[in-house]
Amino acid sequence: MQQVQPRRASYAIWIALAIGAIVVISMISSYNGLVRLSQGVDAQWGQVQNVYQRRADLVPNLVATVKGAANFEKSTYIAVAQARASVGQLSPDVVKNAVNDPKAMAQFEQAQNSLGSALSRLLVTVENYPQLKANENFLTLQAQLEGTENRIAVERKRYNDAAQAFNTRRNTFPTNLYANFFGAQFSNKAYFQAQPGAQSAPQVTF
């Protein structure tokens, strides 16, 4: 009996060590996986910002071009300029935190969608101005804008896909336990919300 008890104690120690090793390995694997997926989300968020910035950069030339058209509706291009200004006034914290903060994401998205809607209205209004339809500079800007809107739709989807991959991994057992242990750095990623027509490229027939 005296020999059996030490053996049982030894077995218990080895079992505890084995369980501990499994937990540590699982935690390390989960941590590394979350880091990799989080970096993927951040990289894709950078791409989203790039295409939105590209669109914002087109606005000044576009507004300047339509302002040159005789009797062009002033309120239309003013709305575009104001929406563009609102995008530019988004605080760096909102842009930075949008990935992890649904409220910041909603604020970012609202500003961008407002600009997209204003641009769509402007391009539709252009149909009433033959001189703009024949303006080579405007046609170039219009083509660039449509291409950029298409890229925005693509990059938004890629971002949402990356965020979904992260969130799925983060909320799967036992990774969710480790993610909660590690804290805010592995909080769920925010999504872009689908809004009918908000992100479709403006279509104008010339």
Residue positions per predicted region:
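A helix-centric hydrophobic-segment signal that preferentially recognizes long
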Residues: 1-206
